[in-house]
Amino acid sequence: MLHKKYRPNVAAIIMSPDYPNACEVFIAERIDIEGAWQFPQGGIDEGETPLEALHRELLEEIGTNEIEILAQYPRWIAYDFPSNMEHKFYSFDGQKQRYFLVRLKHTNNIDLNKHTPEFRAYQFIHLKDLLKRIVPFKRQVYRQVIAYFKREGYL
């Protein structure tokens, strides 16, 4: 059996500032793949903790890291890249991720163009609409992580 190589990564499930009164989650459409909506995520640099990577990635991708951390998924969770995407990520077969559930403090600080843009648009959507909006190869991971946060009473 071949050993798969996964890129260490963090991902943020960003709840709107109205959480817990409203259960709306932030999703963004990738700039390089039209119609590909996802949570903000990104690689963990060498020597960086997952929490440090989370703050850096949010600042880079959505222009703000003014968040309140609500919870963290307790373990790494991995997914494989679709075969047509593998070439983009060098020698990696997929990504292993640490998920953080966070509440955004202010929506007026979101700026997708603050750094090199990775997203073309964003929306806050109701949690029940999430899975039908997300790219198919990430749905199982999203389903598992959301189910965990629901069981723990956060969602």
Swiss-Prot record:
GO molecular function, one term: mRNA 5'-diphosphatase activity
Keyword annotations: Hydrolase
Keyword Protein biosynthesis: no
Segment forming the signal sequence: none
Cofactor(s) demanded: a divalent metal cation
Catalytic class of the enzyme: hydrolase
InterPro entries with a match to the protein in the record: Nudix_hydrolase (IPR020476), NUDIX_hydrolase-like_dom_sf (IPR015797), NUDIX_hydrolase_CS (IPR020084), NUDIX_hydrolase_dom (IPR000086), RppH (IPR022927)
Function: Accelerates the degradation of transcripts by removing pyrophosphate from the 5'-end of triphosphorylated RNA, leading to a more labile monophosphorylated state that can stimulate subsequent ribonuclease cleavage.
Protein name: RNA pyrophosphohydrolase
Source species of the chain: Helicobacter pylori (strain ATCC 700392 / 26695)
Upper taxonomic lineage: Bacteria, Pseudomonadati, Campylobacterota, Epsilonproteobacteria, Campylobacterales
Gene name of the record: rppH
